[in-house]
């Protein structure tokens, strides 16, 4: 029986030796008593030393998923953005951590380029290529040639499969509705606007329907379940939240 898991906001772990292919990755566990581990995390300010990499690595993850805000770099200066990613990527503990791991990821607003930004951010295509460079995405990968950083990888472990579906909640996201009082945003009218955009929705539906994995993990950089805080969330697009629930 297929199982779908939705990873909402951000924070996680990952593990193991991998052999890279575009969409299918075979993982060999060190021994039969070691669990296959996926780790994920987000909100990692590049100017503050991250002391957690060794602790995460001690869980022997085979896969690490960046969940967004991988750097804090609200800017329209792409050199500044590149430099901040370089600071992050050249951290000695991070370099040790990513050795022999599969690295996946998406962005959120502060690494996309502007606070709470969506489709209107004018440097989104340039920012996309910089993120893909940071993740080590091959230059001939399809993610390089299409709009948005959404991606999928299927991990094969002892003849079992885990499909990881990483969404992009920035590139196509239309306008939000301003909230009242101490709430920054409120839900759009039902049916108004989109979070993922038509192309990404079609891709997501196809990836889920065609999956033969035992587990399907969906990664979103913004919260899915929480809808009371008045900040960014799937709940600001109630029709798309409902659509994803039905799809799962």
Predicted segments, located by residue:
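Bacterial Sec-dependent N-terminal signal peptides
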Residues: 1-26
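Metal-dependent phosphoester/phosphodiester hydrolase catalytic core
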Residues: 17-248
